[in-house]
């Protein structure tokens, strides 16, 4: 089955409102991105053979006229004006549902989607995480709830299969209720109001953790213990003064502690796999401290806008100090 015969894009629809394949092959993908219309399927037919329907940025206000798409696997309503999740109960084969950037206030009608692995409800007006049951979405792997008005991590305990959880840009004050989500590999909690790293020690599969732009003042000796697979840690734009607590992260490759209030580096010499350190916009003033703490195999360093970076020989000293360094701040390292 050739892609040309099974895909209809928005440019074709503009010329021909009746959606038909030029061959006998069924249409499986319909892209109506950027074509404003008040009602789905009002002036055009939607082939029941569709596997993928993209209605991004169409000014749609209501989900309707798609329940006949029994084979649909991917449904995208990004950047519309939808206020309610409805009229999708017959889409039993759905694997991906994208409602990013709409007007949703409530999570509802996510019922009996036995194949759903991807759900994006980011950039809406949701206040409470609710109505997400493991019996309804038993295969869920990725859940995106960024940029809503959520104040509490709750009602996710059943969703054990989740590997990627995005709750950034909400109103969270505490990391909590993640005890059962032992399969999480990436956790995004940036741009909240979190003051303490806790409640994640059991996430032994976690590879990426983002807590940027919160209200942290320290990492804490026990906060990250148990995260033996962590490879990337993002802690920029907090009020951190003490980074003690990193020592157990033996797999860590990328550390972002930029834009904090850090004066002294601690524990980095115990992280053998560290490739990148972003420590710009801090208070580090000792070249000796950096030399003692940073592994000689480091490949990328950011220390601009620290007192130490005002040294007239700053760049030359760093290049000599770290023989494998490939990038210092925003500039690639050139060696003679």
Swiss-Prot record:
Purpose: Regulatory subunit of protein phosphatase 1.
Main location group = nucleus
Q: Where is the composition biased (Low complexity)?
A: 1-10
Q: Name one Pfam family in it.
A: LRR_8
Q: What transmembrane ranges does the database entry give?
A: none
Q: What is the lineage of its organism?
A: Eukaryota, Amoebozoa, Evosea, Eumycetozoa, Dictyostelia
Chain segments carrying region Disordered: 1-24
Please give the name of this protein: Protein phosphatase 1 regulatory subunit pprA
| PANTHER family linked to this entry | NISCHARIN RELATED, PROTEIN PHOSPHATASE 1 REGULATORY SUBUNIT 7-RELATED
Family named by the database record? Belongs to the SDS22 family.
Keyword field contains Nucleus: yes
* The species this protein was found in: Dictyostelium discoideum
Tell whether Cytoplasm is among the UniProt keywords: no
The record's section on Gene3D superfamilies has: Ribonuclease Inhibitor (3.80.10.10)
Residue spans with biased composition (Basic and acidic residues)?
11-21
Tell me which GO cellular component terms the UniProt record holds: nucleus
């Amino acid at each position: 089955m050739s892609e040309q015969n099974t895909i209809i894009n928005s440019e074709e629809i503009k010329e021909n409102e009746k959606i038909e394949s030029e061959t006998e092959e069924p249409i499986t993908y319909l892209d109506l991105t950027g074509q404003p219309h008040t009602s789905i399927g009002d002036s055009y037919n939607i082939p029941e053979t569709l596997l993928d329907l993209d209605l991004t940025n169409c000014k749609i206000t209501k989900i309707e006229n798609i329940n006949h798409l029994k084979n649909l696997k991917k449904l995208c309503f990004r950047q519309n004006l939808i206020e309610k999740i409805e009229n999708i109960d017959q889409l039993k084969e759905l694997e991906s549902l994208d409602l990013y950037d709409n007007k949703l206030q409530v999570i509802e009608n996510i019922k009996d989607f036995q194949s759903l692995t991807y759900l994006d409800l980011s950039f809406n007006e949701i206040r409470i995480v609710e109505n997400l049951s493991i019996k309804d979405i038993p295969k869920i792997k990725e859940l995106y709830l960024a940029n809503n008005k959520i104040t509490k991590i709750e009602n996710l305990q059943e969703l054990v299969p989740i590997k990627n959880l995005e709750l950034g840009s909400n109103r969270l004050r505490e990391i909590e209720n993640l005890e059962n989500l032992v399969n999480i590999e990436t956790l995004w909690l940036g741009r909240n109001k979190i003051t303490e790293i806790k409640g994640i020690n059991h996430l032994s599969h976690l590879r990426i953790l983002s807590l940027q732009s919160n209200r942290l003042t320290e990492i804490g000796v026990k906060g990250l213990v148990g995260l033996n697979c962590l490879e990337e840690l993002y802690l920029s734009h907090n009020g951190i003064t003490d980074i003690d607590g990193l020592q157990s992260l033996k797999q860590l490759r990328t550390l972002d502690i930029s834009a904090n209030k850090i004066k002294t580096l601690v524990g980095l010499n115990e992280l053998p796999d560290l490739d990148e350190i972003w420590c710009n916009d801090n208070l580090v003033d000792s070249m000796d401290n950096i030399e003692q703490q940073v592994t000689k195999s480091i490949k990328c360093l950011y220390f601009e806008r620290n007192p130490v970076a005002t040294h007239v020989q700053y760049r030359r000293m760093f290049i000599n100090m770290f023989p494998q360094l490939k990038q210092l701040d925003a500039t690639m390292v050139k060696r003679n």
